Regions:
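Periplasmic alpha-helical coiled-coil/stalk elements that build and connect Gram-negative outer-membrane
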Residues: 3-5, 154-274, 366-369, 373, ...
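Bacterial N-terminal signal peptides
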Residues: 31-42
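Small/polar, glycine/serine/threonine/aspartate-rich low-complexity segments that form flexible
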Residues: 52-58, 102-135, 139, 249-263, ...
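A glycine-/polar-enriched beta->alpha junction
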Residues: 67-77, 84-98, 113-116, 124-141, ...
């Protein structure tokens, strides 16, 4: 972590702005890495391909969703205004005190010989306060450092908006997948009813099987309706990221199926210090170091110099008056503010350490979710789903031959449906965890290898 001496020797003003540039570079890099990771994961398609393989004019990509959210978020607009306000404070900090004009009339409107204005002495004086101890430079440094913190905070807001939008986007992709699964189940169950009626009419099955099949078909329709309602909610949630109601898009375009094994946790933790939330503390440290120098400079007394003509009414003569004034720092040498500034600086490292610990906790939790979802995906994709599909195919074939009943068919359909739903939920959890980890570390996870893509 770069540090600046607390003493009088200090870096030039240009060096103070490097912290903001460093933080901005980290934030831009984090945003780029997030996009790269999502491209590798299939969430940022180059064309509007729906999750179910079709296309639609109303499809929305993640990139477009993030652009909308960034352009419409009120907190970002307020942050931009705050950056402008900080620029005004920096400008004000570099302004010198204005000169003062004063007029002084003596020996007038008195008694005796001083009655009226016959013996009046009139002095017109211009005085200027000269700030000593490098106050102006220290003040400008502090204002620039404070502006860097404001910029860093605004960039963090950008990352938060991107993270929220990505999370809503992934959830909407999952909702689209859930609806597709529910509609497929409803279609499979509905096609079973005519076959059941024919078997009952032929005397091959009891009448109760038609009732059971109809109940299953109705339940599948209800589930499809629930999935459709959940999809509408997820769509509105995404549109709410840029304040749009109702949504003006039909679907979001992305591919949840492109996944791969996560790297080791130690590899991920190695990038934790690149997180912009930690980089912000470099700007905070610089701002507090600058405040220490400001408070030290305020201990130096300022000098006020005045000069001006004096007119003597009695003799009609004129003279010049010079004045010098300076406070004597006997008791107040700004000791309290200097101590406060030093203590504020001293706690910066601990605050950064606490922030890093919080990030580590978040990263560990996100990695746990990633590892858990990957394990579930691997098992579902490798054994459970193929077995469930084979079982359904075998039961359906056996049902046509009279070897299985309708309950067997419905059970096999339900098992496959449950496995497909669990698989979709695991994919959503996987991509949500990836997005969170990439936001925390400001770097992409290793993209899935060829074996992962081909599974």
């Amino acid at each position: 972590m770069p540090s600046i001496s607390i003493g009088e020797t200090h870096a030039p003003l240009g060096a103070r702005s490097r912290d903001a540039k460093a933080v901005s570079r980290r934030v831009i890099k984090a945003a780029c890495y997030m996009a790269i990771g999502l491209l590798a994961g299939g969430l940022l398609p180059n064309a509007g391909a729906r999750a179910d393989g079709g296309t639609s004019v109303g499809d929305l990509t993640l990139r477009a969703a993030i652009d909308r959210a960034l352009s419409a978020d009120p907190s970002l607009k307020a942050g931009a205004i705050e950056v402008e306000a900080a620029a005004g404070r920096t400008l004000q900090a570099g302004l010198r005190p204005n000169p003062q004009a004063s007029i002084e009339v003596e020996d007038s409107i008195g008694t005796g010989g001083y009655r009226g204005f016959r013996r009046t002495q009139t002095t017109l004086q211009i005085s200027q306060l000269f700030e000593l101890g490098g106050k102006l430079d220290r003040r400008v440094e502090a204002a620039i450092a404070a502006s860097n913190v404001v910029r860093a905070d605004r960039e963090l807001l950008r990352l938060d908006v991107m993270a929220r939008t990505t999370e809503a986007f992934v959830k909407l992709l999952g909702a689209q997948r859930r609806l597709s699964i529910a509609e497929a189940r409803a279609k499979r169950t509905a096609t079973l009813i005519p076959a059941l009626r024919r078997r009952v009419e032929a005397g091959a099955s009891p009448t109760i099987e038609v009732t059971r099949g109809q109940v299953a078909a109705d339940m599948a329709k209800i589930e499809a309706g629930r999935a459709r309602a959940a999809l509408d909610t997820a769509r509105r949630s995404l549109a709410a990221q840029w304040g749009l109601a109702p949504p003006d898009f039909a679907h979001v375009a992305g591919d949840l199926d492109t996944v791969g094994p996560p790297p080791a946790l130690e590899t991920i933790i190695a990038g934790l210090d690149d997180n912009p939330r930690l980089a912000r503390w470099n700007s905070v440290r610089s701002a507090r170091e600058a405040d220490v120098r400001v408070q030290r400079s305020l201990a130096a007394p300022d000098l006020t110099i005045g000069i001006g003509p004096r007119h003597y009414a009695e003799s009609n003569d004129a003279g010049v008056v010079f004045s010098l004034s300076m406070p004597i720092p006997v008791s107040n040498r700004n000791q309290g503010n200097i101590i406060e500034a030093h203590r504020e600086l001293a706690k910066t490292g601990e605050e950064r350490g606490a922030a890093r610990l919080d990030l580590y906790r978040e990263l560990s939790a996100a990695y746990g979710e990633l590892a858990e979802s990957w394990a579930e995906i691997s098992q579902l994709r490798g054994t459970v789903l193929p077995a469930a599909r084979d079982a359904l195919g075998g039961v359906q074939a056996g049902y046509g031959q009279g070897r299985f009943g309708v309950i067997d068919v419905l059970d096999a359909q339900g098992t496959l449906n449950e496995a497909e739903l669990r698989y979709g939920e695991a994919l959503v959890a996987y991509h949500a965890a990836v997005a969170k980890i990439e936001g925390l570390t400001a770097r992409p996870l290793s993209p899935p290898g060829p074996s992962a893509r081909s599974e």
